């Protein structure tokens, strides 16, 4: 697979196991992504509050001998409160259908079972980035449209001095019954 060539795309990868972080870093960096890492729920939240990310890939378990995924599920709700559009893809080696459903219910955009397949992981990451970018573009356009339609804003914008005679003519003819 060829690299995307876009190092402007920033991914936060989060896991308490350094070998998992390193494997993800190598895979994603080879695809042209800028990678940041976190090893705890507190570090994840701090990173998200400090910087913008295009996607978060995060483990669900951070404490030793924990396989319930509860830490990650609780973290999902907190991430959603910070940025509800940020796509979060959760990962775990202890996945069940119930855990996947609960993660999605709390805001995860996808669920990846460890060990992962590289092609599927890359496909999920790309898809989530594209969907997030489209959603953010749509929200920006909605905001621009609201501004453009705001009351008191002229329907015609013409600032050049050469347009002054045209605007005067429109002002005279506009209120008349002429067609």
Where are these regions (language model features)?
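Two-component/phosphorelay signaling modules centered on CheY-like receiver
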Residues: 2, 18-42
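Conserved acidic segment of CheY-like receiver
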Residues: 7-20, 24-28, 56
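Acidic, metal-coordinating helix/loop segments flanking the phosphotransfer/catalytic sites
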Residues: 12, 37-55, 64-67
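C-terminal output helix
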Residues: 42-43, 98, 112, 116-125, ...
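Short amphipathic alpha-helix used as the core "switch/output" element in two-component signaling
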Residues: 46, 61, 65-84, 102
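AAA+ ATPase active-site-proximal loops
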Residues: 146-179
